[in-house]
Amino acid sequence: MKSKKPLKITMEDSRRLNDPAEQGGLCPAPVGPSYSEAWGYFHLDPAQPRHRMMSAWATCRLCGLQVGGLPNFQMWTRALCQHLSDVHLPELKKSAAPSSPTTMPCPPPPSPTMAAEGDWARLLEQMGELAMRGSQRELELERREAALMQAELELERKRQALKQEAQSVEQERHQLQVEREALSKWIKKQSPGAQVPEPPSPLPLLPKEDPDIHDNNSDNDMVTKVLL
């Protein structure tokens, strides 16, 4: 009489089945004849499609137990082989069928602390030196760019200051010209018959000279001639 009680496999068991480290460091062999022979002892539930492995069940042809609900084909095969080796090992030995998939020890992982030797060591050393030089050059370039930007900002500030100073000088010259014209009109009104020379046109200012000194002297000379 076949039993319909399914074989329960927890998530922890599935993780251990899928993790070689949990099995004593043994790596599973690739899918081959032994795996296909293990599947020969089971038949799938016809009510479920083959690709929906999480909801399908495989029924053992020897005892009727059901194994299933696993996410991938490899874990399914491991569970089937484990069931055969745990429950039907005598039958498998008699029929000379493999009781479990062929396993081989996993190669040890490369040690991260293993020292490099020979050409590889020299190559690593050269790469480290190049990386250090590149980092130093990048830092130096950043410093130079920052200094150049600071110099450009300072130059722009000086240009703005010179522009404002030139505008101020131009305004002063215009104001001085207006005052000269007003003074000439006042002198003509005070002495109608006197010959008052026209005020000269303003000369361009020389650097580092005070235009007020020359203007005051010319005004004093003009007033002196009129009084005489």
From Swiss-Prot:
UniProt modification remark: Dual phosphorylation on serine and tyrosine residues of the cytoplasmic PPPSP motif by GSK3 and CK1 may be required for AXIN1-binding.
Extent of the signal sequence: none
Phenotype of null mutants: Males show normal fertility however females produce smaller litters. Increase in the number of 2-cell embryos with asymmetric blastomeres as a result of impaired central mitotic spindle position and therefore an increase in the distance between the cellular center and the chromosomes. Disorganization of the F-actin filament network around the mitotic spindle and loss of FMN2-expressing endoplasmic reticulum localization to the mitotic spindle periphery in zygotes and oocytes.
Compositional bias annotation for Basic and acidic residues: 207-217
Keywords annotated in UniProt: Coiled coil, Cytoplasm, Membrane, Metal-binding, Phosphoprotein, Secreted, Wnt signaling pathway, Zinc, Zinc-finger
InterPro entries to which the protein is assigned, alphabetical: ZBED2/3, Znf_C2H2_sf
Zinc finger (BED-type) stretch: 33-95
Domain of life, per lineage: Eukaryota
Localization of this protein: Cytoplasm; Membrane; Secreted
Coiled coil: 132-185
Record's GO cellular component terms: cytoplasm; cytosol; extracellular space; membrane
GO biological processes: actin filament organization; endoplasmic reticulum localization; establishment of spindle localization; mitochondrion localization; positive regulation of canonical Wnt signaling pathway; positive regulation of embryonic development; positive regulation of transcription by RNA polymerase II; protein stabilization
Region (Disordered), start-end ranges: 95-114, 183-228
Predominant subcellular localization, coarse grouping: cytoplasm
Tissue-specificity statement: Expressed in the liver (at protein level). Abundantly expressed in muscle, with lower expression in brain, fat, and heart. Expressed in the spleen, lungs and kidney. Abundantly expressed in ovaries and testis, with lower expression in the uterus.
Ranges spanned by the short sequence motif PPPSP motif, renumbered to the chain: 108-112
One Gene Ontology molecular-function label: zinc ion binding
Role this protein plays: Acts as a positive regulator in the activation of the canonical Wnt/beta-catenin signaling pathway by stabilizing cytoplasmic beta-catenin. Involved in transcription activation of Wnt target gene expression. Plays a role in symmetric division of blastomeres in the early stages of embryogenesis via regulation of mitotic spindle central positioning and organization of the F-actin filament network. Plays a role in regulating the distribution of cellular organelles, via modulation of cytoskeletal dynamics and cytoplasmic lattice formation.
Subunit structure as annotated in this protein's UniProt entry: Associates with the subcortical maternal complex (SCMC) composed of at least NLRP5, KHDC3, OOEP, and TLE6 via interaction with NLRP5 and TLE6. Interacts (via PPPSP motif) with AXIN1; the interaction is direct, enhanced by protein kinase GSK3B and casein kinase CSNK1E activities and decreases GSK3B-induced beta-catenin serine and threonine phosphorylations.
Official protein name in the record: Zinc finger BED domain-containing protein 3
Organism: Mus musculus
